[in-house]
Amino acid sequence: GLWYSAMTQRVGLTPNEDEYVLMGMAAYGDPDRLYYNIKDDFFNNKTRLKNNLHRGCLQWRPDLHTDQDMFDIAAATQKVYETILHTLLNFAVTYYPSNNLVLMGGCALNCSANSITYDYFKNVWIMPNPGDAGSAIGCVLARTKKFISLDDVYLGHNIQGEYPVNKIIKELISNKICGVAAGKAEFGPRAFGNRSLLADPRGIDIKDRVNVIKQRQQFRPFAPVILQEHVDNYFTGPTSSYMQFTS
C-alpha cells in the first residue's frame, strides 16, 4: 500500500488520497512497457528506494514525463500489485485452505484487483470501509469479543425527512444530474445514494457533464446502479453492493 501511494505521487497525484485515480488511469496505459522496470527497481534491487517510499519516489525515472508515460506507469503499477496479490492469495489458500476470505486494508479499495480474489475463494467479504476506520471497528470487536451484523453503510450524520424518490426519478428522466443529501451519511469513501450525484446513463453527454460538475479527469470510471435480478443481463463477474469489484 505504501508503495502504491508512492507511485500515486510519481504520476503527479496526491498520495494517501488519489490512489483510486491511479487505478482508473491504469486502464489507459500499457501494463507491459514498464512492468519489469518497476518490479526490478522497487522490489528486487534498489533497497534505498524500498526504505524511503514514505517520502515518495518523484526521483524515479525523470525521463518519463508525458501524459502517456503517466498512464503507462499507472498500468504497470496496477499489474505489479495484482501480481503480488496473486502470490499472497495462492499462499493463503495453499497453507490455510478455506472457501472464505476476509480482505482488509486500504488496498482492499482497489476494486480492479479485488475481482482476482474469486479465482481462489468462493466467498469474499470486504469491509465497506476497509482502511483504518474499518480496522478500528475490528480492533474494538476483537477486544470486546463481540459479533455484529453490518447490514448497511449508513452510519453517519442523519438528515431528517423522507427520501425523495419521486423527485429524483422526475429529475433523472428529464436528463438532469441530481445531487442527493438525505438520510444517514455513508460510512466510508464511497457514496451509495444518500450523499450522491445521480444521473441517467442513457444521456449522450451525461458522462462529460458529471465530470465537469465533479471537476475530475475524463478517464475516471463510473459506478452503475442496477437491480440484483438484472445484473446477469449486463455484467459478468462478482456482484457487489459496495463498489468493491469490477465486471
Residue ranges with predicted function:
Residues A75, G105, I126-P128:
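Short glycine-centered, acidic/aromatic-flanked micro-motifs in structured strand/loop junctions
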Residues M7, L85, G106:
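Conserved hydrophobic/aromatic pocket- or pore-lining residues that grip, position, or stack substrates
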